[in-house]
Amino acid sequence: NALGMLTSGKVHLNISRDESAELFTKAKNVQINKFSGPHPAGNVGVQIHHIAPISSKDDIVWYLNAQNVADIGEYLSTGNYPNEKIIALGGSSILNPVYLKITKSASLEDILEDRLTLKDGIRIISGDVLSGETRLFNQGIRFYDESIAVIPESTEREFLGWALPGFSKYSLSRTFISALLSKKFTSFNTSMNGSHRAIISFGRWEDVLPMDILPEFLIKSILAKDIEEMEKLGIYECSEEDFSLCSFVCQSKTDVAGIISNGLQLAEQEG
């Protein structure tokens, strides 16, 4: 009801198809939408695309996560805005992945105390590992983030890595022997496993982007700074995090998500 007072539009509640909690499945005064599938099915941009696509720069959509809604409810009920939230702490440099209740202003040094496998040679990421932001020990988690990832910082390059069998390497295209072995957990680090090269169309971006968008043509229109073409190809429906998997799987080592971010900034500047 509180959210309905904040907007003249429809309030959508997006939940997992397997959700069983009646708090969500029987919520009133909202339109309930169910989603399933691997990442990025849970991204708000992907969900908006399938529920009510943004067709122009004049369309406005506000979104909140469950903890934000709970915070608003507590504020309206008690007059006090909560200063705590629950976050997920994970990554291969974390001793035991866990959920934590933290003070929103807590430093990462306090949060990570006695929880790291090592304190040097690591990258601390506020947000998810694909689209988060690198942080220092004396900084805190970003306001809207609900996770912290810590992974090893790669400082060495592997000579002729593409020619090695890759027993423990992840490969979307199944080009390493690891694809033939039994499934096991892969420990990721910050290595790009190669340098940037020309964009070659293999359809990898489309494989991991569950949106009715042509990512290759959109990226090229952004690089060409063609605003009109960007709008035709759906730039207003895009967000950086929705394309982070495209960056991860790109055989050309192209920062697809970064280009999308630049495209959105360019579209905003041009009005």
Briefly describe each language-model feature range.
Residues 1-271:
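Buried, small/hydrophobic-residue-enriched core segments of structured protein domains
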